[in-house]
Amino acid sequence: TAVCTMGLMAGCGNSNVGNTNTQKNASSAEDGYKIGISQFAEHGSLDNCREGFLEGLKEEGIEEGKNLTVDYQNAQTDTGTASTIADSFVSAKEDLICAIATPCAQSAYNSAMNADIPVVYTAVSDPVAAKLANEDGSCVGNVTGSSDVLPVEEQLKMIRAMLPDAKKIGILYTTSETNSCSTVKEYPV
């Protein structure tokens, strides 16, 4: 994701980021890039995605507080809030939006598609089903990212090894999330 982001950041140009944003979790930099990070929930793996994204930028010389302003917002598992966050990033004319998890990625793409603001997503299990990528995996616009597709075959093998006498297994999923629905279809009935 960091390599893709670097390419997108190069296209963003270097903007003055005298940000008047009063968001308490936004840091500031004198000259550099403005990035909005939208995260769907507080969760260890999603937190790791955010931290890894920022670490990747830092390794490339783009560092929060030096030449990078970050406006981090958490949707608290609410898709309406994810949309509001994405709209606010577009209104603020962020240089790039990093969207963590499928609902945030879909909201960011929908909000930014006509605004010439690149979107980088992560923690999206099925970018094609989420309409963030074409069937062949190519970009659908100014959006790119990484997938965290689940290894269904390996999971089933592990379940069989741990519970060889199991006749049925239950799978919990969220019907309102595209990634969840597409993943559950991977399991044999």
What are these regions (language model features)?
Residues 61-82, 142-143, 188-189:
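Short beta-strand elements in bilobed, periplasmic/extracellular small-molecule ligand-binding domains
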Residues 35, 53, 144-189:
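An alpha-beta-alpha
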Residues 34-60, 71-80, 176-180:
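Extracytoplasmic "Venus flytrap"
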Residues 136-146:
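Rossmann-fold dehydrogenase core element
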Residues 8-30:
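Bacterial lipoprotein signal-peptidase II cleavage site
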Residues 1-7:
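Bacterial N-terminal signal peptides
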Residues 45, 49-56, 81-85, 93, ...:
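Stable alpha-helical elements in mature extracytoplasmic
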Residues 71, 75-134:
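Beta-alpha junction/loop-to-helix N-cap segments that form part of ligand/metal-binding clefts
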